[in-house]
Amino acid sequence: MSRLLRRLISPTPPATVQRDTVRLRLEDAEIEVLRVRDPRARRIKLSVDERGARLTLPPRASLVMGERFLEQHRDWLAVQLRQYQGQDLPAALQPGVEGVLPLRGELLPLRWQEGRFARLEIDEHGGCVQWPTRGGDATLRRLLREFYEAQTRADVGRWLPKYLPGLPRAPSRLRLKVMSSQWGSLAPDGSMALDLALVLGSPQAFEYVLVHELCHLIQPNHSPAFWHEVEQRFPAWREQRDYFQREGRRLKAMLRQLL
């Protein structure tokens, strides 16, 4: 049996993540799908975000199995890609060019002023960036990340005291991340992770996610008892869940474009 045939049929599980691309004819165009062999994956998975399509293979899945999975889901893939292409995102920010800054469900006008150090502040006119003459794209991405992290922590700090009574304990730590699909999570040690994209959208939706994760301190599951705890603290949670179904992809796409 040739080496290629062995790889196609029963590849040796890799110790690290491996990436390549596979081309797929889809409707009237040929697209590239990122193929990722991940030792942590348990099943074949096809996903789509603003960067394109991704096929994840577990260690013992063959390339043939992956390509067959792509063929079986080509109609679904075409629909998902059309949805992402139709998203109305603000123009990407460029150093020194006026634009808009997404924050708490609004698009704030953003202006630039010369300064010694990169700094972003909010005032009555919108956002204002103090910008050094040698600032570049990396400086802007770092500035935006620091800004959104500070705004996210400010919101959590404002809401958290209201919900602490009745909880067995406070979260042990707060981590802010760029999450691909989740909005938040609570680890067994009590540390909470939240998606930075939350601060771009509706504050009520963000507050719901915070309450959702806090309730996992009481019920580490999604049982009826868990949803009862959520209902007691945030009765409008269904409306906010619907909001994420409508706007979630757009929020995550905006964050990735910004950072």
Task: Give names to the regions the model predicted.
Residues 213:
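Walker B catalytic acidic pair
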Residues 1-208, 217-259:
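Active-site-proximal or metal-binding-adjacent scaffold patches in catalytic folds
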